[in-house]
Amino acid sequence: MDLFDECLEALGKNKEILSEELTAKYYELLSNSFPLHLGDESSGKKFVVINL
């Protein structure tokens, strides 16, 4: 199981994964604000988790 799958499994019912397009935009904004790594770089999967 890779990091992406582990995070999906750990999310629980009170979380939501943003669409790929929104995730890319949000990740870019965060990256420009401060150093932050989300997802498993080797697989190229990046995602952002938000509280509902």
From Swiss-Prot:
This is Uncharacterized protein YqzI. It comes from the Bacteria.
